[in-house]
Amino acid sequence: MMRILLFLATNMAVMLVLGIILNVTGIAGNSTGGILIMALLFGFAGSLISLFLSKTMALRSVDGEVITQPRNQTERWLIDTVSRQAQKAGIPMPDVAIYHSPDVNAFATGATKSNSLVAVSTGLLNNMTEAEAEAVLAHEISHISNGDMVTMALLQGVLNTFVIFLSRVIATAVASSRNNNGEETRSSGIYFLVSMVLEMLFGVLASIIAMWFSRYREFRADAGSASLVGKEKMIMALQRLQQLHEPQNLEGSLNAFMINGKRSELFMSHPPLEKRIEALRNL
């Protein structure tokens, strides 16, 4: 979930800044064609900037340390396991990092398959068996091999485009009026207010679509892990999460591999654990 939150937060920040620039400067103009062109440019700018910054931002956010030279048996095992799985999945060896956190957590990120990162928490290494941790690593490797971050960026770019375009087209219609001479005029204040409100509203709807896709790709990554290490290991890893964390203890936690069972599934980046386990058993 962490990589998704970072991606969406960066994307929203860029979208907000660019949206204000559009409104203040009026750069998109009044024509539908002009608005569409600017929506495409600015819509994809937010998602692509988020994509290319994802690896650096994720690593800094957890104060993770990339393993350049293994210093102990655990780090050697991590490097060897990720290397073996990456080779089996047909992708270049990603950077591997460890960060200090009591959460049982792991994530993968990066703009391309050749510039990716797999990070695991000390909480995961301390609370999972080797077989369970191996399944989690395979899950993250599958995210990379599936190109999930790139696909998410493209989807977010399309969603951004529709958010910008629709909010400004509607705002233009609402704020426009004709004077006594029959000339069309537009109230800048009304246009700014309406476009900002609609952008936030459409942004929420867009996030529901983005979260749906995120849940879909989690099922795919689980299946990918099953193909790399066997579905029983992946099921064991998910069951371990159920044992370690009661639903109420997940509230407000920042997790990449886990989910909060109490939240509305519409806004969840990960499917409920029981659904993931059931899907694996049905493979």
From Swiss-Prot:
Positions of Zn(2+) binding: H139, H143, E218
Residue ranges of the TM segments: 4-24, 33-53, 147-167, 190-210
Active site: E140
Enzyme superclass (EC): hydrolase
UniProt xrefs under CDD domains: M48B_HtpX_like
Cofactor note: Binds 1 zinc ion per subunit.
Name of the protein: Protease HtpX
